[in-house]
Every structure is written in C-alpha cells, then in structure tokens.
C-alpha cells in the first residue's frame, strides 16, 4: 500500500499545527481497551518514529516478499525436478499403464527386486549344491577313467610279444614263484611223458600206427580249439572294455558340457544380481535425497508463510492506526 508525502511526514515541520491537532482532534491511545496490545508503547511516541517504524516494516515486508519469491522459485524448481523424475519413471515397467508414477510404485518395485534377489540367491545356493554334486560325480568319473586306462594298458601289455611279456611277468615275485612252480610241474610232466613214450615204444605204439595218428590228430584239434578260445576270450574282453570306455567318454563329455552351461548360467545370475543391487542402491539414495529436499522446502515455506502472515497483520494494524490518526488530525 502506497502513502503520499503528506501522510509520511504527518504535516511536515509545523510543530504548532501538530500540537494543535494532538490536543484537539487526535484520538489518544489511552482510549484503547487493552493497553498491553499497543505496539507503539504510549501516546508520547513522535510521528517521525512511527514513520520510521512503518518504513522499516515496509522494508521487512519487501524482504519477506523477496524471500517468498525465492522460496517459490525453489519450489517451482523442486516441482520441475520432481516432474522430471516422474517423466523418467513414466515409461518404466513397474508403473501401471494410464497412471502417473508414484513413490509407492517405486517402493513396490524395489521390494519385488529384493524378493527376486532372495529367490535368485536361493537358486544360486541350489546351483552351488548341484555343482558340488556334479564335481563329485566328475571326480568319480575321472577315477573310473583312470582305472579303465590302467586296464587298457594292462591289456595292451598282454598283447605285446611273448618275450617282453615274460620278462615283465618275471619281475613280479609272486608271478616268478608261480612260474617256477609251473616250470617244475612241466619238468615232472615231461618226465612222465618220456616214461609213457618209453612204455608206448615198448608196446610198439608209434605215431605211424593207426592209434597214434588218431591221438595226434585229436591233440592238434584240442590245441587249435584252446588257441581259438583264448583269442576269443581276449578279443571279447578288449571289445567290452573299449565299449565301456567309449560310453564313459561320451558321458564325461555330456557332464562337462552340462557343467559349462551351469557355470555360465551362474555367472549370468551373479551379474544380474549385482546390477539389480546397484540399481536399487542408486534409486534409494536419489529417493532419500529428494524426500529430504522436499521436507526442507516445505519447512521453509511454512516458516515464510508464518512470517509473511505476521508481517501482514502488523502492517495492516499500523496502516489502520495511521489512517485513524490522519483522519482525526484532519
């Protein structure tokens, strides 16, 4: 509210006129019902002091208006920032279609992320247990493969020339002892054969005879059958071991591929969990900062509103008193 120059100086320097007005027509502050509410203290306050107080209150009101304008600008900037965040979250999957983004949607999304993280951790624990069992099975398979390889080496050594095989067998004390026992038995058998041959020769039984030819033919047949049976047994065992080895190799390859796939899946799950944790932490920090900023702006606005209301009431009372004084002086 603006005042004229006459209203500001209350009649200029004419002290006599002021005194006449004060003694004649001006209403005294003593006539007020409550003297304690008199902001000027008493009726002896000079008009210049009142004018200074009015001017100071006007300056305070202007400062309050400036503060209010700055606070409103800050509020607008905060609203703009909030709108930016809302527009940033508008196209996110956790915001329902046709609705504006709200903090509860973000909180629900974060809670869902936490629950999914918990389920992923449980799946990771299950995968780790499966991995441990696969490692144990793989170790068992490796041990079986080592045993099969040793068996194959033994079979290969059995297929080597007789001299090398005999030399290797003689290095074993148990085999050497068995070989010595068999050698003694062979010598005894040779002695018995010689005695039998002597007896046959004594009864004129020779290989050229009919019985001798039949016996020799039967012996050759038995020897061939024994050799064939030995070859068949050796070949069947080798073939069986080769089949088992091929099956074991295929199983090991399958287990290895499954283990590699499981390991890749675990790495992907770990990366997803880490990214989810980072996103959740960043969003929580930003949300806390914005909440603090909004609370700070609200508190500032409340304080400014209270100050502006008090200042306006004081200025209105002073203006009314000034008008009444001016009217009474006139």
From Swiss-Prot:
Residues 17-26 have a biased composition (Polar residues). One of its GO terms (cellular component) is plasmodesma. Keywords: Acetylation, Coiled coil, mRNA processing, mRNA splicing, Nucleus. Residues 56-308 form a coiled coil. The modification N-acetylmethionine is found at residue 1. Disruption phenotype: Embryogenesis arrest at the midglobular stage. One of its GO terms (biological process) is mRNA modification. Ubiquitously expressed with higher levels in primary and lateral roots, leaves, trichomes, and in pollen grains (at protein level). This is FKBP12-interacting protein of 37 kDa. It comes from Arabidopsis thaliana (Mouse-ear cress). The gene is FIP37.
